[in-house]
Each structure stands twice: as C-alpha cells, then as structure tokens.
Amino acid sequence: EQSIVDRAYTAYTDDSDDIGAVSGWDRDRHDEIVQIGFRLANKLGHDSVAAVDYVQEFTALMSEEDMQQMPQSVVTDPGSVEYPLIGPREGIEQEQQRLDEGSLLAHYRRLNALDGGSFAWINDQHLYATAFEHSEPGEYTLLKLVTAWIQRNLHIASNIWNAPDTDGERVLVVYGASHIPGLRQILTSTPMMAPVSPLPYLGGS
C-alpha cells in the first residue's frame, strides 16, 4: 500500500536503521526496493516513491484441480526440447562471467536490452515453453501461468499510469529485468504513455 511505502521511505531518509520498525513493512534493508529504489529516489531528491508493484504468483489463476497438472517446475529443461532455450542457471552463469570480465555499466545495459535471447527474456521464454509443452488442443490449463504473469504486468502498468500527480509528469520506473519485455510492450501499446529507454542515461553513451 502507498501509505506503508510512504512511511518506509520517510524512515529510510531520516535514518535507514529504523525502516524495519515501520508497521506493515516486511522488507529488510537489503531488499532491492530499499537498496535500489529508495536509494536512487533519495539521491535524486524525490519526496516519495510510488507503490506500483502488484504481487501475484504464477499460479494465482489456477484451481486446486489445475494445480494437480502442474509439472514439478515451471522451468523447462533445455535438453528436453528441440529448440534453443537457455536455462536460468546457465543464463545467470553467463551473465556473471560477462560481469566478471566487464563493467557494471555494460551489465546494466545488457539487463535492459530486449534483443532476442537477452537475459530479460529468459523468464518469459520458460513460461511460454512450459505452458505450450503441457498443452494440447482443448486443454490449456497451464496457459494460466502466462495469463497470470501478463495480468500482473497489466496491473503494474495501470499503477504506473496512476502514479503521477499531474498530467505530463514523467515517472522513473525501476523493475527486475524479467518484467521489462512485458511492461515495455504494454506501455508502448497504450495511447497515453510513452516509455523511454534508460540506456542513454547510463554513463558512457
């Protein structure tokens, strides 16, 4: 809720050690919202941080009967399919190696890239692979995994639209890499919002 985020951000800007005492706030000081969101907002001099996230599990739209059809993991084994698919662990290891050999700037650029096969697409690719591999004509139960993920991003996009206090105000959106493809598609498709890539604002451009 916005009121909880407001109290947490105020506690952070006053004394970050007190943030854990905020009623209703269940994130610790090491959480990405605090370490990235609050820290960046404070550095930029923002008075508040908008609560735009919408928490929803992949299985949120599935019934107990649907859950019985769930595979052990929503991650598809790349070795079990005949098309290119990078496993999450392999993707993380590859990105860690690039980070070890490169720079943080290059790392952040890659995380925000939407090229085919980029790190940001891994989550979507595995959701689609799992849903389609376990579906057949007339049986679409596991497509609910994809539907829930898209629905979550739709709720987030709606919250982003309602975040500004005035028309024309710009909003800086900070999200995990896996949300970038879905949010970019939604925000680009809307007639009232125009997403702008953060890449030119990263130094060295």
Task: Give the residues covered by each predicted segment.
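A cross-kingdom marker for long, charged
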Residues: E139-S205
